[in-house]
């Protein structure tokens, strides 16, 4: 993009390259050029600004230009838009730009582009990966920590898919890049959960995915963010691989620059090595799994007088090649072959044997083309760094059988080697260390052909690996471990080797970055000039080393040497070689080497440094070709003379000599062409010059040590089928080796598992059989016990049935005997049991046609008082003779059976006392007389109830009634002061005490005669009008007093009572034996359900009398009634309903007296009128309140003028309405006195308008409550809803007033009935809890079986399971202590588990924050239960019934902490016996604090405070 006015506003540094004017970018070329940074108008609401976006706008017409110009953009001469930043100040002065606002484009929001297969921009760095983090960090905690930095879209913590353990890795994705960077900066400097983690900005989660694959053996991240999950997996894999390669390139470039800076300090130092030579020296070199690897040749000798060199740097892989004196010369691989006429055969390798196919299926086709080896220098620190990572150890054992063949023409050499390989590999994979040992047997066949090849082109020496090796996926690339040491100069080095050419670091970088389409290791060489030729030889070890191709790790670049003049690279820098300057001096440049003999060591070129060191001198590009220099005392290398090389004219033609002087190292720039592959003869001729046609001397080599790889120097391509496991660090181990190691380890593991499986299986099987047999035996034993118990229960049941039958027979016999005995009981005893309450029901408002005994008026209660008092204090009546019954009575009185029973009791007691002093004959006569008197009295009692009874019988009864009444009256006066409550309680007496006197007949007669009128009224067909108790009694008493009763007819004293047709036969038995007698004698008694005594378990009234009452049983059919006779019936009581019913009132059943039937006329059916139930409650009719008296009207005397003026003058606030009326009157009077408005001070007529004060809002009598039950609306005005009527205007304006304990207790919610010590539960609640217990019957059965099988029931594990499946019956209700409480619905024994305290387990720090928050909200912290020092259970919002347990200073429960499966739980145990309905409490054990909390438990030992 063309710009102008560069001096006016200099561009920013970030756009300096784009803003530079270029002469080539002119004319129409700019118009057609698609510039990345063009300016485009962007419209927003209220703003218009420019930004860089898309292609430049091409103004093709004037209208377009005018449209753009209106927005303030100028046009250049090339018809392009101008950068508005160049002349922004001038634009501000222009009228066009005054209405527009410009903003810098860097402040614009970056668009979130979708990542897909077409994504090619900078990756969005919104993902942050975390490594080495605390394993306690969860996704929730990580998200909480990340929220402090910005919006979190996704947070994930890596969990191992197999072990389900925390992998200490996670990632967080933010909404923006800035937020991700803030998070990275924050936790790069501080800890995350007390652990220093390693955050990384990780686009596409590339680094995290790679580490996850290493840890999980190739599995990818299971959970990704939404945008990454929507990408195709192959596309995402490529994006991750590109990002990782870019990161590796940046790291390599930084390390190379650091290395160059360090190496430049020692550059330029050149020292002469003519006076020095080396001793015998073994180089410990690294070997790696590379197809370019060849072993180095032995080092040249050094003069003895020279000081010994320092020891080489320790390398981890020296143990396998230590006995061989081989030193790698790093410059031999850079020697270029020269043109020569020397005929050297070039050997072509054969195909590898089939045993090699398991390592690499592509190796056999690529060895001939990929046999070039590169070498690179290493610093001592480099070797030290890699020595600790991994190592590979290998030993080769060569057998005695060696074969060599040659054909007739002498052009083919066949060499066979049989060897045994033993390698030991140690390397690190992730955080794991692997160590494996391999033993292999290999066979190599070498064939060669005598021919010469000229180096004509670059393509002949090496070919691309596209044809031989396929593309490798990024997963295989990512398995290569990145370096961890920052002092490595090249992290992608693979092995040492010799090559005829050199490769630059740029080539290595490009190979590492995978910019080529095939993503494989291509080798392209460039022909070198004739002045820079090198030679290449192979030692015996080089011939025995195969060429392994590792497609995982790219080969390292060769050491940087002297670049050629005609080469141009993107980075004009040289990688220096470092060497100590004190030991290696340069030899003379043109010194001729001495002849080589068998006794002398080979040549050595001292112009080259020894292996393992780098030179500190600058490269000499124009140095002449040096003459080979011979060094003495060098041990003979293990070289074998090959007949095919006999064309060499001189002895040194077949033995490698020293290299020439330092030659420039060639660097490859384009790698577009590949040189031809030179032959061995050409390389020899390029090194030593033209060969002569002399036969070389046969060299016989003797070694003091066994040769392991003594082979010919014909060609390195003849070793294609040899396999050598080379050693390197953990990052240069090939994928093949890793696969082999993993397979070998898996195989070994499977073998160990197979060996250990059999005994383990046997042990497990034996243990299972023993356990199974034990269980089966236990089950059989339990089954036998159950069968035995069942049989025993059946026998016991049969025995119980037999005993019951025996007891039944005995009872029948006893009842039969009792029935035969004469009975001397009265029917009144039966009547006392049938009171009104025995027929009553709580759910009914009526009684079964039976009205209760009226509670007599005080003035008519004397006889009742006497009757009740005579029970507690028996009086021995003086009238106990037989003639006392005929004494006359002055008047009739109303008496009851209970009053007559008292007299009978006294009479019977006196008779018993007189019996004790008499003879047996007298006693027998008295018994007969008493029996006849009893029969006579009973007959009189029943005959008096009948209307048809004779007058004689009535007179007899009347006389006896008078006698008993007089005696009752005399005794009543003596006991009139007795307690009324005891009289009520002693009203009911037994039949024995009430059956020996004749007063009962009198009471029955009087009661019966008083009820004749109601009976007559009922026969008229109209229902009797119910009366009150007082009216009924007063009416009856008046009738009795006013009427004159005829004397009754005397009653016979002999004969059975059951013979009378008007009597209902009966017998007196004990109430407990009534059911038995009814079963035994069904024909002579009524059934049990017809009398239903009140003392059974279903009744709610206890027996006040300690003596067991007896009841009277009527006979159903005492005699056959004659046809036409009236049946015997029991009539209801003759009294009407009463208001107050006594607790114990006897019900007397009497014969039904029917009037003679009269013919009645048929009447029209009337509407049925239901009587009102006298026992129902009726609301009283509403009464109108009387009208209030009229208010007294206040009158005030009129004020004087002075008082009015004073009021007006003293008015500071708004005057009230009365004062305003006075002001109005004063204004009107003033204005009326003037003729015109001009005479007024204010020059116009005014109208007074009153100002009303705002009245106080009306308060509601009953404030409206909110949904939570709190008062919300206090005023009638709806606008004042929520306003509290406080005089100060705000509740915060009121001072704090501490409430007393009494005030606090008045505010605590209490149950409705605090007097009840225990809670009362409904039947519905108990039924629901009982059904829940029945539903868990199967679980309890399983629990018992488990306890029985294990035998140990004291373990906490079983206790907690018992708690789970056998919960106690508990319920929460209002507590008298505070709020809600937990109550027991069943009796609980001591030390039994009641309930578990369930809640949310939180840490102590979180508990403190929640406690503060709860206190601010008024909830309180009473639901926080501390387990230990670090954990607290919070049941405030999540819990069960246990959180309702209140505190008590004298609790009946205690809390215990149990550990179940590593998790601590709190269980509530019972301390004492807890009865049904008692509240469950335990001691909160709050720590002692200054701010006291009052305790409301109310226990005897209450401390007063919880804390």
UniProtKB/Swiss-Prot annotation:
**Which residue stretches does the UniProt record annotate as biased composition, category Basic and acidic residues?**
413-444, 668-680, 803-823, 973-982, 1015-1047
Q: What happens when the gene is disrupted?
A: RNAi-mediated knockdown results in disruption of invariant Y-to-PDA transdifferentiation. Results in decreased trimethylation at 'Lys-4' of histone H3. Leads to an extension of lifespan. Leads to a deregulation of fat metabolism and to an enrichment of mono-unsaturated fatty acids.
Specify residue ranges for compositional bias: Low complexity.
316-327, 456-465, 869-908, 958-971, 990-1007
Q: Which residues cross the membrane?
A: none
- Name of the protein: Histone-lysine N-methyltransferase set-2
Q: Gene3D superfamilies from the entry?
A: 3.30.70.330, SET domain
Q: What class of enzyme is it?
A: transferase
Basic residues: compositionally biased ranges:
9-18, 478-488, 846-868
- All copies of the Post-SET domain together span 1491-1507
Organism listed in the record = Caenorhabditis elegans
Tissue pattern of expression reads: Expressed in all cells of embryo. In L1 larva, it is predominantly expressed in Z2 and Z3 primordial germ cells. In adults, it is predominantly expressed in the germline.
| UniProt keyword Nucleus present | yes
Spell out the subcellular localization from the entry. Nucleus
Q: What is the lineage of its organism?
A: Eukaryota, Metazoa, Ecdysozoa, Nematoda, Chromadorea
Q: Does the keyword Repeat apply?
A: no
Q: Supply the gene name.
A: set-2
């Amino acid at each position: 993009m063309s710009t102008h006015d560069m001096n006016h506003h200099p561009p920013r540094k970030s756009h300096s390259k784009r803003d530079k004017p270029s002469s080539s970018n002119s004319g129409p070329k700019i118009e057609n050029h698609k510039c990345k940074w063009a300016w485009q108008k962007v419209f927003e609401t209220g703003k218009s600004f420019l930004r860089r976006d898309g292609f430049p706008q091409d103004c093709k017409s004037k209208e377009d230009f005018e449209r753009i110009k209106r927005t303030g953009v100028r046009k250049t001469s090339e018809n392009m838009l101008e950068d508005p930043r160049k002349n922004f100040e001038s634009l501000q002065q222009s009228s066009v730009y005054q209405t527009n606002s410009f903003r810098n484009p860097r402040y614009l929001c970056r668009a979130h582009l979708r990542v897909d297969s077409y994504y090619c921009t900078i990756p969005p760095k919104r993902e942050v990966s975390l490594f080495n983090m605390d394993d306690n960090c969860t996704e929730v905690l990580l998200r909480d920590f990340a929220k402090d930095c910005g919006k979190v879209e996704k947070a994930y913590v890596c969990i191992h898919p197999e072990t389900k353990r925390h992998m200490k890795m996670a990632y967080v994705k933010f909404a923006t890049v800035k937020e991700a960077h803030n998070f990275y900066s924050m936790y790069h400097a501080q800890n995350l959960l007390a652990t220093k983690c390693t955050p990384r900005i990780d686009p596409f989660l590339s680094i995290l995915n790679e580490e996850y694959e290493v840890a999980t053996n190739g599995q990818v991240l299971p959970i990704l963010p939404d945008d990454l999950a929507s990408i195709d997996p192959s596309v995402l894999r490529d994006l991750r691989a590109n990002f990782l390669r870019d990161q590796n390139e940046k790291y390599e470039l930084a390390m190379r620059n650091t290395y160059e800076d360090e190496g430049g300090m020692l550059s330029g130092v050149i020292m002469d090595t003519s006076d020095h030579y080396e001793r015998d020296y073994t180089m410990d070199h690294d070997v790696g799994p590379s197809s370019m690897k060849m072993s180095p040749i032995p080092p040249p000798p050094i003069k003895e007088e020279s000081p010994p060199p320092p020891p080489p740097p320790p390398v981890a892989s020296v143990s396998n090649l230590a006995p061989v004196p081989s030193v790698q010369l790093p410059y031999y691989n850079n020697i270029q072959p020269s043109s020569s006429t020397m005929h050297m055969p070039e050997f072509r390798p054969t195909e590898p044997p089939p045993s090699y196919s398991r390592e690499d299926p592509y190796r056999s086709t690529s060895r001939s083309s990929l046999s070039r080896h590169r070498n690179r220098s290493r610093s001592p620190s480099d070797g030290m760094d890699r020595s600790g990572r991994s190592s590979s150890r290998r030993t080769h054992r060569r057998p005695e059988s060696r074969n060599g063949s040659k054909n007739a023409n002498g052009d083919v050499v066949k060499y066979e080697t049989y060897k045994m390989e033993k390698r030991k590999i140690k390397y690190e994979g992730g955080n794991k260390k692997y160590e494996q040992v391999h033993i292999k047997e290999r066979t190599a066949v070498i064939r060669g052909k005598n021919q010469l090849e000229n180096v004509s082109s670059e393509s002949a020496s090496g070919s691309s690996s596209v044809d031989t090796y396929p593309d490798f996926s990024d997963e295989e690339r990512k398995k290569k471990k990145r370096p961890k040491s920052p002092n490595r100069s090249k992290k992608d080095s693979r092995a040492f080797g010799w090559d005829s050419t050199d490769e630059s670091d740029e080539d290595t970088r490009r190979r590492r970055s995978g910019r080529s389409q095939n993503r494989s290791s291509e080798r392209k060489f460039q022909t070198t000039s004739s002045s820079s030729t090198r030679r290449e030889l192979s030692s015996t070890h080089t011939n025995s080393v195969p060429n392994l191709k590792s497609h995982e790790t790219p080969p390292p670049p060769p050491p940087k040497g002297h670049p050629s003049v005609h080469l141009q690279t993107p980075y004009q820098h040289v990688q220096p070689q470092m060497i100590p300057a004190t030991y290696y001096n340069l030899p003379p440049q043109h010194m001729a080497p001495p002849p080589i003999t068998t006794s002398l060591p080979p040549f050595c070129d001292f112009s080259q440094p020894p292996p393992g060191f780098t030179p500190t001198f600058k490269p000499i590009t124009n140095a002449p070709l040096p003459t080979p220099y011979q060094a003495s005392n060098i041990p003979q290398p293990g070289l074998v003379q090959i007949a095919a090389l006999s064309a060499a004219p001189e002895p040194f033609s077949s033995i490698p000599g020293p290299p020439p002087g330092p030659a420039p190292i060639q660097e490859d720039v384009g790698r577009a062409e590949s040189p031809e592959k030179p032959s061995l003869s050409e390389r020899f001729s390029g090194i030593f010059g033209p060969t002569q046609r002399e036969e070389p001397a046969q060299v016989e080599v003797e070694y003091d040590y066994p040769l392991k790889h003594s082979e010919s120097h014909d060609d390195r391509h003849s070793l294609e089928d040899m396999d050598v496991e080379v050693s390197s660090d953990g990052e240069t181990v090939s994928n093949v080796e890793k696969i082999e190691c993993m397979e070998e380890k898996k195989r070994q593991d499977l073998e160990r598992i197979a060996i250990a499986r059999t005994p383990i299986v046997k042990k497990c099987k034996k243990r299972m059989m023993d356990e199974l047999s034990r269980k089966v035996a236990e089950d059989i034993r339990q089954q036998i016990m159950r069968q035995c118990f069942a049989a025993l229960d059946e026998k016991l049941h049969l025995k119980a049935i037999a005993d019951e039958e025996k007891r039944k027979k005995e009872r029948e016999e006893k009842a039969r005997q009792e029935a035969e005995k004469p009975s001397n009981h009265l029917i009144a005893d039966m009547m006392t049991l049938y009171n009104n309450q025995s027929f009553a029901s709580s759910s009914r408002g009526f009684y079964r046609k039976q009205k209760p005994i009226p509670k007599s008026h005080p003035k008519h209660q004397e006889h009742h008082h006497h009757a009740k008092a005579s029970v507690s204090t028996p009086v021995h009546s003086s009238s106990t003779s037989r003639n006392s019954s005929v004494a006359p009575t002055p008047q009739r009185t109303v008496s009851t059976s209970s009053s007559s029973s008292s007299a009978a009791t006294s009479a019977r007691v006196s008779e018993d006392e007189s019996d004790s002093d008499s003879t047996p004959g007298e006693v027998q006569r008295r018994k007969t007389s008493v029996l006849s008197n009893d029969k006579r009295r009973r007959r009189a009692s029943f005959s008096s109830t009948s209307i048809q009874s004779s007058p004689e019988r009535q007179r007899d009864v009347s006389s006896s009634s008078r006698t008993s009444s007089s005696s009752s009256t005399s005794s009543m006066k003596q006991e009139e002061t007795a307690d009324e409550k005891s009289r009520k309680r002693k009203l009911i007496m037994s039949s024995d005490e009430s059956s020996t006197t004749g007063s009962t007949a009198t009471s029955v007669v009087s009661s019966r005669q008083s009820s004749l009128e109601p009976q007559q009224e009922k026969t008229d067909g109209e229902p009797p009008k119910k009366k009150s108790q007082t009216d009924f009694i007063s009416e009856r008493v008046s009738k009795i007093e006013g009427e004159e009763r005829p004397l009754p007819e005397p009653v016979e004293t002999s004969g059975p009572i059951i013979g009378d047709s008007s009597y209902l036969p009966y017998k007196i038995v004990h109430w407990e034996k009534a059911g038995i007698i009814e079963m035994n004698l069904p024909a002579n008694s009524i059934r049990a359900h017809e009398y239903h005594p009140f003392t059974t378990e279903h009744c709610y009234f206890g027996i006040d009398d300690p003596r067991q009452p007896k009841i009277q049983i009527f006979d159903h059919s005492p005699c056959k009634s004659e046809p036409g006779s009236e049946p015997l019936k029991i009539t209801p009581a003759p009294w009407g309903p009463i208001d107050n019913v006594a607790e114990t009132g006897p019900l007397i059943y009497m014969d039904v007296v029917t009037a003679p039937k009269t013919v009645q006329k048929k009447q029209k059916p009337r509407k049925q009128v239901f009587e009102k139930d006298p026992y129902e409650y009726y609301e009283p009719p509403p009464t109108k309140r009387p009208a209030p008296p009229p208010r007294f009207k206040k009158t005030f005397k009129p004020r004087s003028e002075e008082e009015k003026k004073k009021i007006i003058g003293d008015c500071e606030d708004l005057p009230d309405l009365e004062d305003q009326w006075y002001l109005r009157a004063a204004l009107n009077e003033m204005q009326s006195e003037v003729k015109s408005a001009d005479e007024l001070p204010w020059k116009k007529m005014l109208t007074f308008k009153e100002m009303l004060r705002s009245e106080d809002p009306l308060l509601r009598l009953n404030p409206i409550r909110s949904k939570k039950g709190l008062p919300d609306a206090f005023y009638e005005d709806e606008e004042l809803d929520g306003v509290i009527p406080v005089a100060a205007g705000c509740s915060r304006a009121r001072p704090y007033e501490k409430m007393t304990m009494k005030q606090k207790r008045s505010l605590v919610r209490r149950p409705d009935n605090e007097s009840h010590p225990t809670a009362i539960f409904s039947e519905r609640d108990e039924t629901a809890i009982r059904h829940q217990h029945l539903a868990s019957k199967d679980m309890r059965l399983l629990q018992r079986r488990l306890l029985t099988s294990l035998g140990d029931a004291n373990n906490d594990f079983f206790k907690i399971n018992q708690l789970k499946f056998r919960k106690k019956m508990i319920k929460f209700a209002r507590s008298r202590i505070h709020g809600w409480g937990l109550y027991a619905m069943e009796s609980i024994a001591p030390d039994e588990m009641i309930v578990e305290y369930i809640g949310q387990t939180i840490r102590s720090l979180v508990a403190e924050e929640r406690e503060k928050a709860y206190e601010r909200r008024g909830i309180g912290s009473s639901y926080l239960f501390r387990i230990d020092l670090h954990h607290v259970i919070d049941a405030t919002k999540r819990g069960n019934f246990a959180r309702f347990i209140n505190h008590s200073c004298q609790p009946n429960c205690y809390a215990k902490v149990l550990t179940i499966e590593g998790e601590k739980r709190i269980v509530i145990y019972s301390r004492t016996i807890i009865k049904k309905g008692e509240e469950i409490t335990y001691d909160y054990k709050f720590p002692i604090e200054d701010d006291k909390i009052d305790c409301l438990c109310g226990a005897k030992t209450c401390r007063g405070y919880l804390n």
